[in-house]
Amino acid sequence: MNALHFGAGNIGRGFIGKLLADSGVFVTFADINQTQIDQINQNKQYGVKIVGDASRVEVVKNIAAINSKDEEAVIEQVKSVELITTAVGPNVLGFIAPLFAKALAARLEAGNTQPLNIIACENMVRGTSFFKAKIFENLTDSQQAEIEKFVGFVDSAVDRIVPPAELNEADPLEVTVEEFSEWIVDKTQFKGQIPDIKGMELTDNLMAFVERKLFTLNTGHLISAYLGKQAGVKWIKEAIAIDSVKAAVKATMEESGAVLIKRYNFDPQAHAAYIEKILKRFANPYLNDDVNRVGREPIRKLSPNDRLIKPLLGTLEYGLPHKNLVNGVVMALQYRNEEDPQAVELAQFIADNGVAAAVEKYTGLTNQEVIDQVVALYN
């Protein structure tokens, strides 16, 4: 089986690309980093350093790479592969959608109507459905109808902490990852036979898993980063070692967890164990996870479908406590990082228009009581 994977960054190499290659899939990475592309094509392998109680390096083989700016090369791949995955970041999906539209149209014209499945492995809710909508903006109604027949747009939930690691001179492509990984896909959205990939779990209730991960791992990670930054530490593991930070992170995840328990009928004890597992992952002494990396892009993280506002809206829907989630929103608004364009834009908007206007613009919150709480805490 041949797959095209967009994004040869840490997640691409250390998580999705590795699972595919481990399952005997030949993986072609598409990226804009020509140095990395050359290294993949020259070395034809790279190491994945899995860190935890028993660290080890596993070698990934059966790989090649192309430059995603080379439209012809991308189109040729899309015309023939059986699976396409992405790990490019939510913001990039919209940029690559026109090329995907052109490539899928070319596959159609070439007469290849074999099933093709596309899975966006991004930190967003129903990322593949979003990607599909962006692709379809660039196609005619008749092209869309034909593509719908043989292309499956499969939503997924992904979870693995893959922070940047020090360069290994002997293997510049080596990537460091935690032991834990979770890749859950919506089995109802595939076209043709579902590929047999070790580590890819199938479900017909994806939203429960998407929101479990978003409301717990992503929410907790972000709160750890903001509190860690306020405490003056560099790494998530240092932040979570501070008792008051750990308590606040846990309390926030319990608030968002109450929404999940109500919405999806999760077992409270099982979810409490899931929270403890995540706290342990944050404390992994072998992972250097920078608080600025985790805290970056506050505008995206304040959006209505992301890790702060979505669970907060859930607490309002079910009449549940949300004090810690409101604190999270305040910390996102207070996040300052001169090297992060979104942080700069947010700070400027608040300076020009005030906190209440920023809450309205970026979060979509309409509950006046909550908006007033955010403004009061911010000031």
UniProtKB/Swiss-Prot annotation:
MF terms in GO: mannitol-1-phosphate 5-dehydrogenase activity
Domain of life (superkingdom): Bacteria
EC number: 1.1.1.17
Gene Ontology biological-process annotations: mannitol catabolic process
Pfam family membership, one: Mannitol_dh_C
Keywords per UniProt: NAD, Oxidoreductase
Reactions listed under catalytic activity: D-mannitol 1-phosphate + NAD(+) = beta-D-fructose 6-phosphate + NADH + H(+)
Sequence positions that bind NAD(+): 3-14
Enzyme class: oxidoreductase
Family: Belongs to the mannitol dehydrogenase family.
Name of the protein described by the UniProt record: Mannitol-1-phosphate 5-dehydrogenase
Species of origin: Actinobacillus pleuropneumoniae serotype 5b (strain L20)
Organism lineage: Bacteria, Pseudomonadati, Pseudomonadota, Gammaproteobacteria, Pasteurellales
Gene designation per UniProt: mtlD
